[in-house]
Regions:
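A carboxyl-terminal module marker
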Residues: 4, 441-448, 469, 524, ...
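Mobile "lid/hinge" segments at catalytic clefts and subdomain interfaces of large enzymes
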Residues: 116-131, 135-141, 152-162, 166, ...
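Beta-rich nucleic-acid/ligand-interaction surfaces
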Residues: 42-46, 205-207, 266, 494-495, ...
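Extended, well-folded interaction surfaces typified by the phenylalanyl-tRNA synthetase beta subunit core
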Residues: 416-581, 729, 782-786, 794, ...
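Glycine/proline-enriched, intrinsically flexible loops and inter-domain linkers
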Residues: 7, 25, 30, 42, ...
Length: 815
């Protein structure tokens, strides 16, 4: 989101001599990144090329009854000849001359011309031609004192401005106003000893009046922790004065009327949203802050009828709703030219509530942008007083009664303990205790307590993202200047360090492998909804890391696994007719130990992992049936991935995958340590139903720390290419259903020792031709001796041992 800041408006609050370009550079250096800087002129082009000139001679044109040939003094040694058709041109006049090359209006360029045979080198201008008036009765005649050669821009005193567009991050709502930007810039200038002064408008003249104000009733205190209403009677709604209109136009806002313009002005001045209601339209003479009725209909200012949810916070009167709180006003309660009495709302609304309503109704407004990110709860009173005083000044009227307020629980400023040595350790430079304190004072931090080694500070209420010491350190560092932290002259490192696998290289290798096999990488939000974990045993809800101030209940916990985010992606694609999905993700997962108090870091755990997903069927080909994604296809990818780093999947310890996540599958652990490496299988129907998925999904999750441990264990070794041929043999055996291929493979390699190189399963048969509870495996074996060519006797001896082992250990029968 971009915040538009008018340079001239900004200087109302910050006295300094910085040019717009210097202001933009300073803002970017302190974390308010300026995306664009645009010069704004009262008249487009600034009348460049138009100057004050004096008519020295004026004679009639010989071939015209209305044209005049004039000679003008422009300040140059030679007079300039201009043919003019204005009836009021005369010698001795001071006029505004558009010289050759000047562009007036959109595209009217002044050129050297010949009019009725006489050369003309410019144009003497009327008001409408310059864009400063509508008169075209004649040329614009200036006062005799006008100085020849003066640019028209300077003579007319045309205003210029600069529009600074700041790319605001979600945590910097404190800079979503001119005063907010001025505060930050003031701290920067003070730290750099640049003369400046911060001017915050005084509201001490505000005084409550006599009579009865419109009362308020807040029944949804959780949605409106602080709500105020000011009643102003006898206002005259009209067009705003020119200065106010210019300020709003400078940042792209359309002036409406003086009352509405004042609320918009204060919003962009202070950052506190306001709303003005026509008091005559408040039925029952009372304002109620409540939740909407489920299914309630409400027509907003844009004329759209909206269906409300019981979660929507509403501003209502005794009979019906008037406004979606903090989001959008209603069609029937707004201020019009007929309004004489105004109810002025200033409030602090629950950010989560506002965000959900804004998202639910697809309404993004300046007010909702600020409320959902956390407006300043302590600016509510100041903004209301500022707007009320401006309404009295520009629209007349009197404040009636006392300001009505609901503020049951006072919101206190956050207190943070600071250790100066730790701050300098984080910064990487000894900047001095005095510098730390001066920066914090310039940023309006209050020192609750000071010691020789640190301090206790109260954080300004508008800094909604500052909670901990590290947050304060970030504030200090951005004002001190990242560029002022010098790199050390020497870096200490061992020149004999053994080469180790680089995590980034390994991750890139994994990503390249998966992408080459048709997987698409996804990146999901680490925040998710707690409801996903309510029925899981493997990842129980009580182990979720909860967010203190979630923007939404859909984003109220950190994810414990990548599997659920992946199912969200698959459901999203299937709903858009993309049924064949192969994705992978690398990201962090988080968990909380409920047996601990949660106040220390050892209560929480974070680690990274990979997740792979296959679902659906690829597009059909004329050459080959691609087949549907299945369990064994996924297992094949996992096997190849592990083999890429020197790990045989059959060397891993296995156990059944958790049943709440997979209907069938395996969990793999590192041998010896039992450290979990991967889990894979067919996603359980209950999980698919949770996301509305009606086709099978096959998923795997791989622990990155365990995988990297494997990479470090398996060093690359040189192996000589075999000189002697390999021999292949097949074996078909009848087995009990309980016997697994992995068991057979492990036994085969134990018996075959150095001659057996590969074991494969190429056919499985179950059917009415064999007994119930039995299955037939067709196995392939590759044998090879590195020192000689195998004879038939050598091969038969190994195959006999294999068959004997299968018969004795597994009850196998040769087919």
């Amino acid at each position: 989101r971009y915040m538009k800041i008018s340079y001239n408006w900004l200087k109302d609050y910050l006295e300094c001599d910085l040019a717009p370009e210097a202001v933009a550079e300073a803002l970017t250096s302190i974390g308010l990144e300026v995306d664009s800087l645009e010069q704004i002129e009262e008249i487009p082009g600034g009348l460049a090329g138009v100057i004050v000139a004096e008519v020295v001679e004026c004679v009639e044109h010989p071939d015209s009854d209305h044209l005049h040939i004039t000679k003008l003094n422009t300040g140059d040694p030679e007079l300039l000849q201009v043919v003019c058709g204005a009836p009021n041109v005369a010698a001795g006049q001071k006029v505004l001359l558009a010289t050759v090359g000047t562009v007036l209006g959109d595209d009217f360029k002044i050129k050297k011309s010949k009019i009725r045979g006489v050369e003309s080198f410019g144009m003497i201008c009327a008001e409408d031609e310059l864009g400063i008036g509508e008169s075209h009765d004649g040329i614009m005649v200036l006062e005799p004192e006008a100085v020849v050669g003066t640019p028209a821009k300077d003579y007319l005193g045309l205003a210029t401005d600069a529009l600074i567009e700041i790319g605001l991050t979600a945590n910097r709502v404190d800079a979503a106003s001119h005063i907010g930007v001025a505060r930050d810039l003031y701290a920067y200038l003070k730290h750099n000893n640049i003369p400046c002064k911060l001017n915050i408008p005084d509201v001490s003249a505000f005084a409550e009046g006599e009579g009865e104000a419109i009362p308020i009733e807040v029944t949804a205190v959780d949605g409106a922790p602080r709500y105020t209403g000011t009643t102003i009677k006898g206002v005259k709604v009209a067009a705003s004065p020119e200065w106010l209109q210019k300020k709003l136009l400078a940042i792209g806002l359309r002036p409406i009327n003086n009352v509405v313009d004042i609320t918009n002005f204060v919003l962009h001045e202070v950052g506190q949203p306001l709303h003005a209601f026509d008091a005559a339209k408040i039925a029952g003479g009372k304002v109620v802050v409540r939740r909407a009725e489920e299914g309630e209909k409400f027509v907003t200012l844009d004329g759209v009828e909206r269906t409300l949810s019981a979660a929507d916070l509403m501003i209502a009167n005794a009979e019906k709703s008037m406004c979606i709180a903090g989001v959008f006003g209603g069609e029937e309660s707004g201020v019009t030219e007929a309004t004489t009495d105004v109810f002025l709302e200033s409030a602090y609304f629950n950010p989560v509530s506002i965000r959900k309503s804004s998202k639910r109704h697809g309404l993004k407004t300046d007010a909702s942008f600020r409320y959902e990110r956390g407006a300043d709860p302590l600016a509510v009173e100041y903004a209301a007083r500022r707007a009320a005083l401006l309404i009295q000044e520009l629209a007349g009227g009197q404040i009636v009664g006392k300001v009505q307020e609901s503020y049951p629980e006072k919101i206190e400023k956050k207190i943070v303990d600071l250790d100066y040595d730790r701050i300098e350790g984080f910064v990487g430079k000894k900047i001095g205790h005095e510098v730390i304190e001066s920066i914090l004072e310039a940023l309006a931090y209050e020192f609750v307590e000071k010691t020789e080694t640190g301090a206790k500070v109260a954080v300004p209420s508008y800094m909604i993202d500052v909670y901990r010491e590290c947050d304060v350190i970030e504030e200090i560092l951005r004002i001190y200047g990242y560029n002022n932290i010098e790199l050390p002259q020497a870096m200490r490192m061992s020149v004999n360090a053994p080469q180790k696998p680089e995590p980034e290289q390994v991750r890139k290798s994994i990503a390249d492998f998966l992408a080459a096999n048709g997987f698409v990488e996804t990146m999901n939000n680490s925040l998710t909804k707690s409801d996903y974990y309510s029925k899981l045993k493997t990842f129980p809800e009580e182990k979720c890391v909860r967010i203190m101030n979630p923007l939404s209940s859909d984003l109220n916990v950190m994810r414990q696994t990548l599997l659920l985010n992946g199912l969200e992606v698959i459901a999203y694609n299937i709903n858009r007719q993309i049924n064949n999905v192969k994705t992978f993700e690398y990201g962090s997962v988080y968990s909380f130990d409920p047996s601990k108090d949660g106040k220390t870091l050892d209560s929480y755990e974070e680690h990274t992992c990979y997740a792979l997903f296959i679902s659906g069927q690829p597009d059909k080909s004329w050459r080959v049936d691609p087949g549907k994604g299945n369990y064994f296809q996924l297992k094949g990818y996992l096997e190849l991935l592990l083999k890429r780093f020197g790990c045989d999947i059959y060397s891993l310890e296995t156990e059944a995958a958790p049943a709440d996540l997979f209907s069938e599958g395996l969990a793999y652990n590192l041998p010896g340590s039992h450290q979990p490496l991967a889990v894979m299988g067919t996603v359980a129907p209950a999980r698919l139903k949770q996301f509305g998925i009606k086709q099978p999904v096959f998923a795997a999750e791989i622990s990155w720390p365990a995988l990297f441990e494997l990479v470090k264990r398996n060093k690359i070794k040189y192996k000589e290419l075999p000189k002697f041929p390999e021999v292949r043999r097949d074996l078909a055996i009848l087995l009990d259903e309980s016997v697994s291929y992995a068991d057979l493979r492990k036994s085969a390699f134990r018996v075959g020792k150095k001659l057996l190189k590969q074991v494969g399963l190429f056919d499985v048969y179950r059917g009415d031709k064999i007994a119930e509870g039995k299955k037939q495996y067709a196995l392939s074996f590759v044998l090879q001796d590195l020192d000689k060519t195998l004879t038939d006797n050598d091969v038969e001896r190994v195959m006999s041992k294999l068959l004997s082992t299968f018969q004795n250990e597994f009850g196998a029968v040769l087919r």
